[in-house]
Amino acid sequence: MARERRDSKAATFFCLAWALCLALPGFPQHVSGREDRVDWTQEKYSHRPTILNATCILQVTSQTNVNRMWQNDLHPILIERYPGSPGSYAVRQHIKHRLQGLQAGWLVEEDTFQSHTPYGYRTFSNIISTLNPLAKRHLVIACHYDSKYFPPQLDGKVFVGATDSAVPCAMMLELARSLDRQLSFLKQSSLPPKADLSLKLIFFDGEEAFVRWSPSDSLYGSRSLAQKMASTPHPPGARNTYQIQGIDLFVLLDLIGARNPVFPVYFLNTARWFGRLEAIEQNLYDLGLLNNYSSERQYFRSNLRRHPVEDDHIPFLRRGVPILHLIPSPFPRVWHTMEDNEENLDKPTIDNLSKILQVFVLEYLNLG
């Protein structure tokens, strides 16, 4: 009971402190004129973030802890976890358990389906975690949790896909944990526009090909879910709008965790959101909040353009969803090798990128 009282007092203090942050200079209120918009599916195109000031950036970044993330979230995921394997089940249970234990009260669902593969029919399970299912619009942060299948090796090694994509999974879980109070505050807000915009985390199964990448042997989870969301009415009872139209922005994380990543712009129609990541990176650097970081090795480079690469965003892109693809170019040197393991991860880089992503999410959700 004493613990519950302390938690209650801490939550009350947090809400007061966060409300004070909202009142400080540098936190513009939500964009005026939204009340005049009739078609909510178009609001994503005029949506503007609320820029966090230095005070709140310091508060937000103090809440995240890369060592705790490493122990509590990354280690349990750094196992062989190809679709249908015991490791896949264990990781799926871990992700659900971590999200279900948070104050914010996420709705955590498994989207299970069967699909034909080069090895016959296999069962796949996506994990969809929604902060507020009643909200019309959702910022989506996504990654895949499966690891690529490799036949048994003579030396007994297994592929654990540290950058591909254990680290993105752990970053998303840490985001949900470290921002738990802000997200609880958002969910409890009953006034527009906050009530109409929320957060969704998606962990895809079956991103990797079993044999060779092809339209039929890859992206099993995202192909299935995009099709399902394109045919599921949203909000419930709607006749002409569907879940996929409720995606404001689809942010996909992949191949993250190696040192000195470079993220280029893949889609010009979301370049303004990429620009926010670049600006947040600079702000955190100016505040001395990035570890082992050199401004000469900037992560996000809006002056660098690359052709899109195939990944879990493709089925959503084809249905008109705005995409922000956070995958480095070039890929990590350990990509699809047994060396994509914990030894070759760079903890300061992961910590820095986690901070940038968390600030970005708060700004997008107008929680600044």
Curated annotation (Swiss-Prot):
Starting at the broadest rank, the lineage of the source organism is: Eukaryota, Metazoa, Chordata, Craniata, Vertebrata
* Signal peptide residue numbers: 1-33
- What's the protein called, per UniProt? Glutaminyl-peptide cyclotransferase
Q: What does this protein do?
A: Responsible for the biosynthesis of pyroglutamyl peptides. Has a bias against acidic and tryptophan residues adjacent to the N-terminal glutaminyl residue and a lack of importance of chain length after the second residue. Also catalyzes N-terminal pyroglutamate formation.
Please tell me where Zn(2+) binds in this chain: D164, E208, H336
Keywords carried by this UniProt record: Acyltransferase, Disulfide bond, Glycoprotein, Metal-binding, Secreted, Signal, Transferase, Zinc
Where in the cell? Secreted
Which reactions fall under this protein's catalytic activity?
N-terminal L-glutaminyl-[peptide] = N-terminal 5-oxo-L-prolyl-[peptide] + NH4(+)
